[in-house]
Amino acid sequence: MKVIIPVAGLGTRMLPATKAIPKEMLTIADKPLIQYIVNECVAAGIKEIVFVTHSSKNAIENHFDTSFELETMLEKRVKRQLLDEVRSIVPNDVTLMHVRQGQAKGLGHAVLCGKAVVGKEPFAVVLPDVILADFTANPKTENLAAMIKRFSETQCSQIMVAPVPQEDVSNYGIVDCATDNIRAGETAKIAKMVEKPSIENAPSNLAIVGRYVFSATIWDLLERTPVGVGDEIQLTDAIDMLIEKETVEAFHMTGRAFDCGDKLGYMEAFVEYSLRHEKCGQQFQKIIKELAKSL
């Protein structure tokens, strides 16, 4: 199965940091955000990754490309560990492809841009703003990996969800399921989706996390999706049409997620991952403990 990762967005929520740097290249500890996303996909067994990109995002392509000059320098200076880290950014059996989204016409349009590469077959979509903590769930067997497994067993499209505080439902796409009592790793049939409902009208507190596995049926629906909110082609509109044609399931996320397209979420992720850094984690813990004394 291939995965589409839309990276054409301008990252306005993270300005001024993203004025000259793609938001996906902002670092968490010592890796850019997009590296965590690719690692998740690879751990889930995906071998073909399609970036839907923009002319300002060359740094992403460069990050995953071979840097002969850098590798030669590290080899000459006998920095073997760093050389191995650079060379292992993308496993040899994983193929990365890049497709341009010429105009910013929304997430639905971005996904549709990947059709020529993916072909008329099932595929996954992973939004790069959201990192799933690999220290709270096993990416080889849970979350995206489990969604792909569930799809292969049932042929039902999967949408990852997680509970959010009731007062925050208006910030998210919310799913209406036959039951609200699904636990981590479980699924439930979706009756409908509501984009950023009011607190009073929210059918549940299960918010879409940014991981999808779609049947090939979604392609024709995306092509027929009219321009919606913000003069954009909305992925949620296509999913609503998909729900009318076939079973679509909500898959309950396991563990924690960080919204790194939001400044506070990004800061939280940075601290959490830095505390667990293999080399610097213990020293960083001491720094945080000292800082905490003055709060």
Swiss-Prot record:
Record's keyword annotation contains Transferase: yes
SUPFAM superfamilies: Nucleotide-diphospho-sugar transferases
EC number(s) reported in the record: 2.7.7.9
Keyword Transferase: yes
InterPro entries: GalU_uridylyltTrfase_bac/arc, NTP_transferase_dom, Nucleotide-diphossugar_trans
Entry-linked CDD domains: UGPase_prokaryotic
Pfam families found in the cross-reference section: NTP_transferase
GO biological process: biosynthetic process; UDP-alpha-D-glucose metabolic process
GO molecular function: UTP:glucose-1-phosphate uridylyltransferase activity
EC class (word): transferase
Sorted UniProt keywords: Nucleotidyltransferase, Transferase
Catalytic function, reaction form: alpha-D-glucose 1-phosphate + UTP + H(+) = UDP-alpha-D-glucose + diphosphate
Homology family: Belongs to the UDPGP type 2 family.
Job of this protein: May play a role in stationary phase survival.
Name this polypeptide is given: UTP--glucose-1-phosphate uridylyltransferase
Organism in which the protein naturally occurs: Haemophilus ducreyi (strain 35000HP / ATCC 700724)
Underlying gene: galU
